[in-house]
């Protein structure tokens, strides 16, 4: 007897999801070998391939479903029955949370993101794991105290096998023990404790991370050991037990971790314990499930919307030439809409802007570029849109809007973590805050450049300050690869009057960049000039940028750590 069409379609979607996630895990599993072999180019290529997997599989699944439906076509009634059949299949799927998101993506793709009915989507989770799912199979647990910690650490490091030996395991054990004894929570001196470590290693860039927590007397502290490779051996770079630093390590401005997680929801439950203030969607993003992170973000947004009463407003700061940005004051996210026409002198197309955002999604963000999510036909309650914001959107992006009696629907937008624009931060900062922010700003530009990203527009308004005081770039319409730039020094004037001319006395090609000119628009305030020239003088010299380009061209991958240099054991030992 032939299966009902809805049953066949539901089973096909689930099979295609399982095929996608199997390939996702296969790419992830290669991380250990890439780390052991210092295959840093392979790390980048694998990251890009894994990000592209989801859309590829959703597209192929959508095409197959349309073929299966044939003359029946995809009606809302049929898709409602498909969802019912899919829900019946979910109990057999361990990774049902991400499977729901995959179903949503296929449904939206079939209807080209139009005439979407919430009841045919998994707006709310269909299944729940309960508040306290069993995590024991994921963990190694070590019960110890500060006196016996060295023996525990020796066992712990031995439990994680690599083909490379430790450079000096005993030295690393001494460093971890010393650092925890001198700087760790005081309660570790007073009580025995348990260290719970995830069995699976987290890989990102040049690092491998053992990720876990310390549990003592009802309190929980992070316990993260970053491992680095010399090419011949590995070593522990530091120990992280500070909640703020753990949150930065699993940050929204970094490349996604590669961690073998057949059931990512269980990893999220565990990580939530050491980062209770980080929303689930950011944790899903961090472990590479960014498409399900998008689902979780939407659910988080809906929940916040229901619990708040204020209106969406234009975001603080200087208005962008390419984007109109707005936010809900109590919500930690901004919404960015591409304008219909760009403010001169911007000379890019809509498709070029979207291509830049795709580039950022697939590139190593080195902790300095905010992650984004892209939405189509995003709905807002009309009565929650302030009159000023509605007038602004009608003026700058009318083609992106559909307005009904009770809804504002925006055809296309990006979401991004809310930060304080650096220019606004500097306006209110004292001398110490200014110095730290400018140090961060210069470091952000240098680290992006070392990762082959030139920001293009380096004005302070295009950078944000996070709650942890880090400076992150968030305006992508002018970014390009460093290797595409032609850094030049300004030629000397031919005649004295050249310096007073409104036009340059030298030819300028489209990709020509003159770092000396950065000072003109960045260093207008004497205090800023003084600090920048102390900390980042080389940024204004074309030779510095050419040197970075040379490193990139010969395959030098710079070390970028998600913690300050003084946190590294090597630095503490005077190395």
Swiss-Prot record:
User: What reaction does this catalyse?
Assistant: L-seryl-[isocitrate dehydrogenase] + ATP = O-phospho-L-seryl-[isocitrate dehydrogenase] + ADP + H(+)
**What pairs make up the disulfide bonds?**
none
Q: Which residues does ATP bind?
A: 315-321, 336
One MF term in GO for this entry?
[isocitrate dehydrogenase (NADP+)] kinase activity
Q: Which GO terms describe its biological process?
A: glucose metabolic process; glyoxylate cycle; tricarboxylic acid cycle
Question: Subcellular location, in the record's words?
Answer: Cytoplasm
What are the UniProt keywords, alphabetically?
ATP-binding, Cytoplasm, Glyoxylate bypass, Hydrolase, Kinase, Nucleotide-binding, Protein phosphatase, Serine/threonine-protein kinase, Transferase, Tricarboxylic acid cycle
One GO CC term, this protein: cytoplasm
Catalytic positions? Answer: 371
Signal sequence, start to end = none
Q: Which residues form a coiled coil?
A: none
InterPro entries membership:
AceK_kinase (IPR046855), AceK_regulatory (IPR046854), Isocitrate_DH_AceK (IPR010452)
- Kindly report the protein's main subcellular placement as a broad class: cytoplasm
EC code: 2.7.11.5, 3.1.3.-
Q: Which domain of life is it from?
A: Bacteria
Q: Which Pfam families match?
A: AceK_kinase (PF06315), AceK_regulatory (PF20423)
**What family, per the record?**
Belongs to the AceK family.
Q: What does this protein do?
A: Bifunctional enzyme which can phosphorylate or dephosphorylate isocitrate dehydrogenase (IDH) on a specific serine residue. This is a regulatory mechanism which enables bacteria to bypass the Krebs cycle via the glyoxylate shunt in response to the source of carbon. When bacteria are grown on glucose, IDH is fully active and unphosphorylated, but when grown on acetate or ethanol, the activity of IDH declines drastically concomitant with its phosphorylation.
Q: What is this protein called?
A: Isocitrate dehydrogenase kinase/phosphatase
Species of the source? Aeromonas salmonicida (strain A449)
């Amino acid at each position: 007897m032939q299966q009902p069409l809805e049953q066949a379609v539901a089973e096909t979607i689930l099979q295609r999801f399982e095929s996608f996630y199997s390939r996702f895990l296969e790419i992830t599993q290669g991380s250990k070998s890439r780390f052991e072999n210092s295959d840093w180019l392979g790390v980048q290529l694998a990251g890009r391939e894994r990000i592209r997997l989801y859309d590829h599989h959703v597209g192929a699944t959508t095409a197959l479903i349309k073929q299966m439906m044939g003359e029946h076509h995809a009606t809302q009634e049929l898709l409602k029955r498909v969802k019912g059949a899919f829900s019946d299949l979910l109990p057999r799927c361990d990774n049902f949370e991400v499977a729901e998101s995959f179903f949503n993506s296929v449904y939206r793709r079939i209807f080209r993101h139009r005439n979407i009915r919430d009841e045919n989507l998994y707006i709310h989770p269909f299944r729940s794991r309960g508040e306290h799912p069993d995590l024991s199979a994921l963990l190694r647990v070590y019960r110890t105290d500060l006196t016996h910690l060295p023996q525990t650490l020796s066992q712990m490091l031995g439990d994680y096998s690599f083909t490379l030996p430790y450079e000096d395991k005993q030295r690393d054990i001494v460093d971890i023990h010393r650092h925890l004894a001198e700087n760790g929570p005081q309660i570790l001196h007073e009580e025995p404790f348990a260290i719970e470590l995830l069995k699976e290693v987290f890989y990102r860039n040049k690092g491998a991370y053992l990720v876990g927590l310390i549990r003592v007397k009802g309190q929980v502290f992070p316990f993260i050991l970053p491992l680095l490779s010399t090419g011949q051996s590995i070593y522990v770079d530091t120990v992280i037990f500070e909640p703020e630093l753990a949150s930065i390590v699993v940050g929204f401005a970094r490349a996604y971790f590669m961690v073998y997680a057949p059931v990512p929801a269980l990893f999220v439950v565990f990580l939530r314990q050491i980062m209770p203030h980080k929303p689930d969607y950011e944790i899903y993003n961090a472990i590479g499930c960014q498409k399900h992170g998008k689902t979780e973000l939407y659910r988080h947004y809906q929940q916040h919307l229901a619990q708040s009463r204020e209106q969406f407003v234009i975001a603080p700061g200087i208005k962008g030439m390419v984007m109109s940005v707005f936010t809900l004051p109590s919500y930690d996210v901004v919404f960015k809409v591409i304008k219909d026409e760009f403010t001169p002198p911007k000379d890019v197309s809509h498709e070029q802007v979207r291509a830049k955002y795709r580039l950022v999604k697939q590139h190593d963000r080195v902790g300095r570029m905010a992650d984004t999510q892209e939405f189509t036909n995003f709905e807002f309650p009309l009565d929650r849109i302030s009159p000023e914001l509605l007038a602004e959107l009608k003026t700058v992006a009318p083609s992106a809007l559909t307005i009904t009696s009770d809804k504002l629907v925006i055809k296309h937008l990006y979401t991004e973590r809310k930060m304080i624009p650096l220019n606004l931060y500097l306006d209110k900062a004292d001398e110490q805050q200014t110095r730290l922010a400018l140090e961060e700003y210069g470091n952000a530009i240098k680290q992006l450049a070392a990762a082959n990203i030139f920001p293009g527009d380096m004005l302070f308004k295009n950078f944000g300050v996070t709650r942890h005081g880090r400076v992150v770039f968030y305006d992508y319409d002018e970014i390009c690869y460093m290797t595409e730039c032609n850094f030049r020094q300004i030629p000397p004037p031919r005649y004295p009057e050249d310096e007073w001319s409104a036009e340059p006395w030298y030819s300028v090609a489209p990709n020509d960049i003159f770092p000396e000119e950065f000072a003109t628009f960045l260093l207008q305030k004497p205090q800023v000039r003084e600090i920048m020239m102390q900390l980042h003088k080389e940024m204004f010299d074309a030779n510095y940028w050419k040197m970075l380009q040379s490193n990139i061209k010969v395959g030098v991958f710079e070390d970028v750590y998600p913690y300050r240099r003084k946190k590294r054991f090597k630095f503490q030992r005077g190395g």
